[in-house]
Curated annotation (Swiss-Prot):
Belongs to the polyphosphate kinase 1 (PPK1) family. Its cofactor is Mg(2+). Keywords: ATP-binding, Kinase, Magnesium, Metal-binding, Nucleotide-binding, Phosphoprotein, Transferase. Pfam families: PP_kinase, PP_kinase_C, PP_kinase_C_1, PP_kinase_N. HAMAP family: Polyphosphate_kinase. Catalyzes the reversible transfer of the terminal phosphate of ATP to form a long-chain polyphosphate (polyP). It catalyses: [phosphate](n) + ATP = [phosphate](n+1) + ADP. This is Polyphosphate kinase. The keyword RNA-binding does not apply. Residues 434-468 form the PLD phosphodiesterase domain. Mg(2+) binds at R379, R409.
Amino acid sequence: MQTQLGENDISLPQYYNNRELSWLDFNYRVLQEAYDKNNPLLEKLNFISIFSSNLDEFFMVRVAGLKDQVKMGYDKPENKAQMTPQEQVDAIQEKAKKYVDTQYERYNELMIELKDYEIVMCEPHELSEPLLSKLERDFKLTILPTLTPLGIDAYHPFPKLNNKSLNIFVDIDTEDAINSAIVQIPSLIPRFLTYNEGAKQYVVMVEDVITYFINYLFTGYEVLNTFTFRITRNADLTIHEDGAEDLLIEIERFLKERKSGSAVRLEVDGRTENPDDLDWLIETLEVDKQDVYFLNGPLDLTFIFGLVDHLSHKLNYLTYEKYSPQIPRSLGNNNLYELALKRDIFFHHPYESFEPIVDFIREAADDPNTIAIKQTLYRVSKDSPIIKSLKEAAEKGKQVTVLVELKARFDEENNVHWARMLEDAGCHVIYGMTHLKTHSKIALVVKRIGGELTSFVHLGTGNYNDKTAKLYTDMGIITTNEQIAEDAINFFNYLSGYSVKPEYNKLIVAPFDIRDVFIDRIDKEISSHLQHGNGKIMMKMNSLTDKAIIEKLFEASQAGVKIQLIIRGICCLKPGIPGISENIEVVSIVGRLLEHSRIYYFHNNGDERIYLSSADVMTRNMIKRVEILFPVEDKEIGKRLVDFMDLQLSDNQKGRYQDEHGHYHYVENNLSPLNSQVYLMQEAIKYGQELKKRSAQPSGMPVVSKRRANWMNRIRRSLKK
């Protein structure tokens, strides 16, 4: 359907989802995975844990920021759904509590299912006498010495309780008066203890153990009442970059300050029976009653990560079947550097191994012909092999320049450590850009080959993190394209010095140009569609919040352009609204792997324009971050990207479509089941097996591939079965 442009006001709030509420809906889609009958039991539990971990960060950052606005009296509505900060806080609390109640309901159901496998979550009093004796002995030896009861009276003010710490509130009868104390549970002691008896394994939470033996801490007094609570604090504090002589020192100050930010959420054991104690705690922490969450189970369900890890040794059949990333199809058994001199090499992680990217830096560090290595780092693993190679390269006299983004949220401490280590090794380390986060993923290796300098460039959508590369779906390209190489050199010169914004040949860089290029490409697609009637836009990203681009997508929809958006997380655009967005569809895929790649496709009357990027279509990515959008010009790689998006749009197992009201629904059709992530794993394994067969063939013998059939044709045939 085509609508007259400008017929409707595309800025009206009813056409938009609020950013924060849309994020909560995404996190609920994560929780839905704990209900999926196709997921193994321990993986269902993991999704319960991921939901909690996500929600913690959401409160520490997003809710904290809104509450700061409310305290300052700021009541200006946000620019899409037109909700004031207070309206957002109220709506968040209502929706979050509903989802948390669902989470705990599901948690308790899964704990019952665990009993079928002889795993029993229990409290100390439910243990047999022999096990209770063991528990008491373990408490005295390994837990009691670590505990410090903190009295609360005129001589003992309310203690500073760390963010996300677990605490026990205690009322004690001291004969003269009823006093209170707090016992903070150290984060370094195990969250649960396990005991075997017969075929069963019993799991006891450490807070229940401490509560059961609480009298050991208050000898001579009667303990009247206890309850467990947990505080979430504001972690969205300001890093004062202006005037900071050393950003490393400023970041370290910020990290200390973040541990004791104002409280934004109070979680309490739902069995709490003393309302006076709770009221006193609410008043002391200066939280509102709507900030209090009564939970029907253990506080902080992120402990499940450790529990699943513990149980998976015995119950590995209740986890996903192990998957090993395969050799990249674009690389095969070729030497990476030799092949890159001939053509671009494409990588799709974690279906395809991240190891070649690690080798890209490792081999550059080892090669005496390498002159320079330059790289941006946003999040890396704790024992990063890439960091190791960069250090070794510098120690061997190579010119190594590394931008380590110190402001990468919740990775600041890790990145400060790496920055210091790289500097000590002789690397030139850049801490980032003032008032901007450098989120781009780029590495440049300069080698002397045949007497000339040749530049190899890796551009990607995800972090240089060998651990998360096994869980996050990301894409990247290694190229020796001379124009991109020149752009990469100019990009690093811009980061490392005081040069003005460079003019790039092919790279498109935020905060300067990405938004403008997107708007220009959408405008061109509108014009092309009005002339040829075949306009089409496909975009895959993590989140869509930028209003200028949303409005432009609305215009394209009104012009009749077909728009397909694959958005895992936040989506402020409502699709399917007559006269506004009826030509837009939005699908979210949440599954075993975290969808993280960003792809942008414009049909352009058959002269397709395809890009990969580190950037989502969020306002922060457009104006507050250094991002790279780069073109995919290799036709074979471009076809793989289009086929991939078609595949994801056909996913009827993990795909959820958003309706015109902003609600998400599982895809329901009569086609054969298709889980796009599982399909890609299977395809990667098939290619790996075929590659091994080829390698085993005697030299000189012809190899006939059985994979000539078009990829998407095979998918379509399978869906018709």
